[in-house]
Amino acid sequence: MSSGGLLLLLGLLTLWAELTPVSGQDRPKKPGLCPPRPQKPPCVKECKNDWSCPGQQKCCSYGCIDECRDPIFVN
């Protein structure tokens, strides 16, 4: 294989390794809504999605704040 082909293969392997796995992205969200935004320092990243939070907690996004919170339920 030529050096150009090897570089292309190496580049593609690097891109593939950097991709985020999609295994948990098609799960449904947990029930309930996120409560109002808390008063916290900016840009706190506690979670990536509902399933990275314990129990019934949801991953709530408030701008650059992502944190696990107990859900609220609206009738």
From Swiss-Prot:
It comes from Pseudonaja textilis (Eastern brown snake). It comes from the Eukaryota. SUPFAM superfamilies: Elafin-like (SSF57256). Residues 27-72 form the WAP domain. It is found in: Secreted. Disulfide bonds join C34-C60, C43-C64, C47-C59, C53-C68. One of its GO terms (cellular component) is extracellular region. Expressed by the venom gland. Keywords: Antibiotic, Antimicrobial, Disulfide bond, Secreted, Signal. This is Textwaprin-a. InterPro entries: Elafin-like_sf, WAP_dom, WAP_four-disulfide_core. Residues 1-24 form the signal peptide. One of its GO terms (biological process) is innate immune response.
